Amino acid sequence: MNFLQFFIWGSWLCTLGLYMTTPVEDGGLAFDGALVGSVFALSGIASLIMPALIGVVSDKWVNAERLMGVLHWVGAISLFCAAFVTDYDLFKIAMLVNMLAYMPTLSLSYTVAYNAIDKAGLDRIKDYPPVR
């Protein structure tokens, strides 16, 4: 599960900078360095805010598996929309929505894994590292 969780992020994060700086004639967005940096800064902002908020929602109202699924769908839709956007402001909004949806799923994946380990009657300290 952790492999797939980080595979999602790595599948687009590695090439996003190149896509944003490539000229429009070559299929890119032709953003300058400051615009590219501001898009990448969204992940830091989202990672400070959203895990705590979604953690409260997960603890009180919605189970972690469902919430994680909904957030991954929101992220997928926002990335799909970002692929068709050429305007910087709209692209930044699409990436912000993606980051706001993706960042809490990192901690939710650990919650789901720990819950599965507990249900199986295993020890988290001893049995989680090999699973990871």
Short names for language-model regions:
Residues F7-T15, N63, P104, L108:
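Short helix-kink/termination motifs in transmembrane helices of multi-pass secondary transporters
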Residues M1-I45:
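Helix-loop boundary and gating motifs at the non-cytosolic
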Residues F3, G75-S78, Y88-L106:
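Hydrophobic core of transmembrane alpha-helices in multi-pass small-molecule transporters
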Residues V62, F84-D89:
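Helix-breaking motifs and short loop linkers at transmembrane-helix boundaries and internal kinks
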Residues I49-N63:
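Helix-to-loop junctions at the C-terminal end of transmembrane segments
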Residues R66-C81:
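Structural signature of the two symmetry-related core transmembrane helices
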Residues L96-V131:
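Cytoplasmic helix-loop-helix junction between adjacent transmembrane helices
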Residues W9, S43-P51, Y102, L106:
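Residue-level signal for conserved functional micro-sites within the alpha-helical transmembrane segments
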